[in-house]
Amino acid sequence: MSYTEIVAFKNQESNHTKDVKNAFRGAMAVWGLMEEKHLALKSAPWDPTQKLSRTSLMDPNGVKEIWELANNKDVPIDERIVMATTFDRVVVKRENFDKIIKAMRSFDKTYEGKSSILEQADIIESFIQDEDIDAVAWNQTSVNSNPWFDWSEEKEEEVPYNLSKNKDHWFLFDDLVFI
């Protein structure tokens, strides 16, 4: 079964992961729950009377509409923050762990535990105990390679992603204007 990986960074390098079973309960659940609450379902192209989610229609523009909820000021801020955690290459610095945990717990309460967000919040909260952990990130599904570990041709092995040296990431509370 697939899983969502929560990646801990120590001294700016990806260090280890904690897994949350069933990746479908992560990003896909967040997208579906928020779509259901904030957007009208779409008509199926083959039957306009049948209403379907944007993800089930595999409509790239429809999925973008879901992602845009992160910028929609009518959507509660905690929900927008959680939506942003589902985006590629997002990182949350230690100084913002309390904010992300609060947002995740609020999201879980709003959506009555219909996702793995509470489990993710618990993992991040456990990271607070380790003062060497300076950031967290997500690999939303284990069916792909983890973007937080690079391949070294020279060493012929996986090497940690470094937040100071590598630049293919962004910081949730620094780089998005909506927060």
Feature locations, PLM:
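Acidic (Asp/Glu-rich) sequence patches and key acidic residues
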Residues: 1-179
